Design a protein with these regions (language model features):
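Conserved N-terminal phosphate-binding loop of PLP-dependent enzymes in the Aspartate aminotransferase
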Residues: 1-280
């Protein structure tokens, strides 16, 4: 357990590198990441970001990352070399505009990584814990990655807590003294995270997210042609592209705020909607 999502990502990277060196004998491990990714704003994480807002002015950057297009399994397989330690991806890219990959893509990634002995790391910090309609978004493709990165909703909106979840044969490369965090796993955070997990174990909120998500997306799709050019997403999570003739996504977000609707703009033209799972 850690505190923030970015810490979970950093932990996942450390595990992947340590596993590659200790188990596979790779002395210069590389991690394949996706174009359009967002995994946080720490120095290492922005080293493989392609967002100039997050990246510009913060170099020199950490090496060891290779970027491929999101949703392109063939490009991913072509990028794998004997030095490839892991593939890190978001099952649904949130900051990019709630971008959903083609059906079967995640299953293909799992097939490719398994065939090459490469770890698959699913960053479910935004997409996980019922947000997309299942406990994790990789479930849409029936995938079980080597590592799950969890955060945000894990703290119930109350406390910062994140986690890296996987089997002992992978996580076991971290031995006492190799990794830690002062407040990681503190009693309050652990209690809240445990309560969240128990609530999700009922399946009620996953079902609620799917059912209300259908209503959300159906309603948003009716706006197509009236200032909306595209609607994407899963469960209670949607990305809506705004026609530039209407204004910027930030302009629209501020107008919605005046009407009591909270939305977050991203990349000038997209609004993201992520209503609470308890919404009526």
């Amino acid at each position: 357990p850690m505190n923030t999502g970015a810490e979970a990502v950093e932990t996942g990277i450390k595990v992947a590198r340590k596993y590659a060196q200790d188990v596979r004998g790779i002395t210069a491990p590389e991690i394949i990441v996706m174009a359009g990714n967002f995994h946080g704003r720490t120095t290492t994480v922005i080293s493989f970001s392609d967002d100039p807002v997050a990246r510009d002015g913060f170099g020199p950057f950490t090496p060891g990352f290779v970027t491929v297009p999101f949703g392109d399994a063939a490009a991913l397989e072509s990028a794998i070399t004997p030095n490839t330690a892991a593939v890190l991806l978001e099952p649904v890219q949130g900051e990019a505009g709630v971008v959903v990959p083609p059906t079967g893509y995640l299953a293909k990634v799992r097939e490719i990584t398994a065939a090459h002995g490469v770890l698959m790391i699913a960053d479910e910090i935004q997409s996980g814990l019922a947000r997309t309609g299942y406990t994790t978004a990789v479930e849409y493709d029936g995938v079980v990655p080597d590592l799950y990165l969890l955060g945000k909703a894990l703290g119930g909106g109350v406390v910062p807590v994140s986690a890296v979840v996987g089997n002992a044969d992978v996580l076991g490369v971290l031995t006492p003294g190799t990794h830690g965090s002062t407040f990681g796993g503190n009693p309050l955070a652990a209690a809240v995270a445990t309560a969240v997990i128990r609530i999700l174990a009922t399946g009620e909120f996953q079902l609620r997210s799917r059912e209300l998500g259908e209503r959300l997306h159906a309603g948003l799709r009716t706006l197509a042609g009236g200032g909306v050019t595209a609607v994407r997403g899963r469960g209670l999570w949607a990305g809506v592209d705004i026609d530039p003739a209407l204004g910027s996504a930030r302009d629209v977000a501020l107008l919605l705020q005046k009407r009591g609707i909270l939305a977050k703009d991203t990349h000038e033209r997209t609004l993201r909607f992520a209503p609470p799972l308890v919404i009526e």
